Amino acid sequence: MTDQGENEKKQRRSNATIAVACLSFFVCMIGAAYASVPLYRIFCQVTGYGGTTQRVEQYSDTILDKTIKVRFDANIANGLPWDFKPMQREVTVRIGETTMIKYEAHNLFGEETYGRASFNVAPGRAGAYFNKVECFCFTDNTLKPGEDLELPVVFFVDPEFVNDPDLKDVKTITLSYTFFPIDKPRPVVNAKAVGSTRNGG
């Protein structure tokens, strides 16, 4: 009986250890899933992998005589009742020239709705040379019923584009945005205002 009792205790301890290990693994996988999205986004923005454009803080200082056509595409994921489209379907720009175009979003629903856009470039290799100075990607946007919103994009094509042998026959680049529905953004607390209230002014 004693041996049997000891075996049962060992079995229970073993089961408990396995349960804790499985739970820890599950929690780690959930954390990795949430972390993978921003990490993948950063990786793509740095490398241009998968047609992801580059994000820069300054304009190009070199403008070439060669031109390229840039087309603009707009998509809406299921569950977001918006009309979303580029205000210009395409432009022809000089390589290195900074250009601004605009998209427009309209809430078709009778309630306030919320969306966030992701983006891509085709052909994929061109993403490494498509530089955005200003864009609305990965920003939470709120639209009231019937509200319209203009969404500017400022970009240029890196002059190094012409030196890439894999892109020598590319005459057109397509910039594509897709809006996805998101939950209502949480309000941001104004720390200064809170501090002023506590101090009586």
UniProtKB/Swiss-Prot annotation:
Periplasmic compartment residues: 37-201
Top-level division of the source organism's lineage: Bacteria
Keyword annotations: Cell inner membrane, Cell membrane, Copper, Membrane, Signal-anchor, Transmembrane, Transmembrane helix
Compartment(s): Cell inner membrane
InterPro entries attached to this UniProt entry: CtaG/Cox11_dom_sf, Cyt_c_oxidase_assmbl_CtaG
Bilayer topology annotation: Single-pass type II membrane protein
Biological processes annotated in GO: respiratory chain complex IV assembly
Pfam family, one: CtaG_Cox11
Entry's transmembrane regions: 14-36
Keyword Cell inner membrane: yes
A single Gene Ontology CC term: plasma membrane
UniProt keyword Glycosyltransferase, yes or no: no
Cytoplasmic side stretches: 1-13
GO molecular function: copper ion binding
Function, as annotated: Exerts its effect at some terminal stage of cytochrome c oxidase synthesis, probably by being involved in the insertion of the copper B into subunit I.
PANTHER family given in the database record: CYTOCHROME C OXIDASE ASSEMBLY PROTEIN COX11, MITOCHONDRIAL-RELATED, CYTOCHROME C OXIDASE ASSEMBLY PROTEIN COX11-RELATED
Record family assignment: Belongs to the COX11/CtaG family.
Protein name from the UniProt record: Cytochrome c oxidase assembly protein CtaG
Organism listed in the record: Brucella canis (strain ATCC 23365 / NCTC 10854 / RM-666)
Gene: ctaG
